[in-house]
A protein has these predicted regions:
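Walker A (P-loop) ATP-phosphate-binding motif of ABC ATPase nucleotide-binding domains
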Residues: 2
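Hydrophobic anchor at the beta1->P-loop junction of P-loop NTPases
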Residues: 5
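Conserved substrate/cofactor phosphate-moiety recognition/catalytic segment
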Residues: 8-11, 15-66
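Short, solvent-exposed loop/turn segments at secondary-structure junctions
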Residues: 10-11, 55-57, 95-97, 146-148
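NTP-dependent small-molecule kinase module
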Residues: 19, 108-109, 117-155
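Glycine-rich, phosphate-binding/catalytic loops in enzymes
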Residues: 22, 66-69, 106-109
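Substrate-gripping "pore-loop 1 plus following alpha2 helix"
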Residues: 64-79
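A glycine- and Lys/Arg-enriched "phosphate-lid" helix/loop adjacent to the NTP-binding pocket
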Residues: 79-130
């Protein structure tokens, strides 16, 4: 079994991933990306991971020439490899204001650039939904508004 968690920075992915690892005895894998399709498949075949970002983030945050997979390879992963490796996909989202607050709290922005951050985050959230739709990913959407306390109280 594998669990892939994707979503905009500041939605609570890492918090959820760490709690799932503790609860299910799975290994935590954070953002380090395989170099090609074969490496993605090998990691999923090995199994037992909670991936805090996997292949979808690179389509959202990178330009086409920086991506390590094509759209066709992404579809292959979601249509063939995910089901064969018992991989569950979670998409974590939160309101833009919540994301901005969390990013500022951890030093990844400041109050002077909130209008720019708002535009950027809305774009990222929209791009995630577009990429998931294009790839035909069946996913469970999680509301990341509750934060760490919500995850702890409900596990």
């Amino acid at each position: 079994m594998n669990i892939v968690i994707e979503g905009c920075d500041g939605t609570g992915k890492s918090t959820i991933a760490k709690h799932l690892c503790e609860m299910l005895g799975l290994q935590y894998w954070h953002e380090s990306q395989p170099r090609n399709l074969q490496e993605y498949v090998q990691m999923l075949d090995y199994g037992g991971f909670v991936f805090d970002r996997f292949c979808f983030g690179q389509f959202v945050y990178n330009t086409p020439d920086q991506r390590k997979l094509t759209v066709e390879e992404l579809k292959y992963l979601t249509e063939k490899v995910f089901p064969a490796t018992n991989t569950v996909f979670l998409y974590v989202d939160a309101h833009t204001d919540t994301i901005i607050k969390r990013l500022i709290e951890r030093g990844e922005g400041n109050e002077k650039i909130i209008p720019e951050m708002t535009k950027y985050i809305k774009n990222i959230r929209g791009t995630y939904r577009s990429v998931l739709r294009q790839a035909g990913v069946p996913y469970i959407e999680i509301n990341g508004e509750g934060g760490a306390n919500y995850v702890k109280q409900n596990n």
